[in-house]
């Protein structure tokens, strides 16, 4: 059984996602912000196959959360959710680090069918740490002047 960590600062979204994913046969862990998600991931000793996270959240946004979590758990795949119709620099102005082209995103609101289809699609992709085309993001201190 695959484990999915669902993170959204809206409890109703977490509950909806949890109910849909449990019904589809997944094990679900829930957090209402990025910091709580990192604590849950640290305490969870088994693999977390997918991080399903909102993009715009207080304190630690979804992109920053994904970066921290995948550094600790490189085989964890990431699916973003967002109710905002903005990407790239516009999103960065709202919430910190921005999505990159090709990052999988599920628009909110979503249906149970759309959620389970997108989760299945992302889980079927090769693990980021095993892909020869892994998009490791350099830290700012590693950038060339």
PLM regions: where:
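Charged docking surfaces used in two-component/phosphorelay signaling
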Residues: 15-23
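Acidic, metal-coordinating helix/loop segments flanking the phosphotransfer/catalytic sites
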Residues: 30-50
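Acidic catalytic/metal-coordinating carboxylates
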Residues: 32-36, 60-65
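Short amphipathic alpha-helix used as the core "switch/output" element in two-component signaling
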Residues: 39-42, 63-76, 91-96
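Active-site residues of response regulator receiver
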Residues: 54, 82
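Receiver (REC) domain active-site loop signature in two-component systems and cognate sites
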Residues: 57
């Amino acid at each position: 059984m695959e484990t999915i960590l669902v993170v959204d600062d809206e409890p109703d979204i977490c509950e909806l996602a949890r109910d849909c994913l449990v019904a589809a046969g997944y094990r679900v862990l829930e957090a209402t912000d990025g910091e709580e998600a990192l604590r849950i991931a640290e305490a969870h000793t088994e693999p977390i196959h997918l991080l399903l996270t909102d993009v715009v959240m207080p304190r630690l946004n979804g992109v920053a959360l994904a970066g921290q979590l995948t550094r600790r758990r490189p085989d964890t795949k990431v699916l973003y959710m967002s109710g905002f119709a903005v990407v790239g620099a516009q999103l960065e102005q709202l919430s910190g680090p921005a999505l990159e082209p090709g990052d999988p995103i599920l628009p909110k609101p979503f249906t149970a069918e759309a959620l389970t289809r997108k989760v299945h699609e992302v889980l079927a992709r090769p693990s980021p740490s095993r892909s020869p085309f892994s998009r490791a993001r350099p830290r700012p201190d590693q950038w060339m002047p």
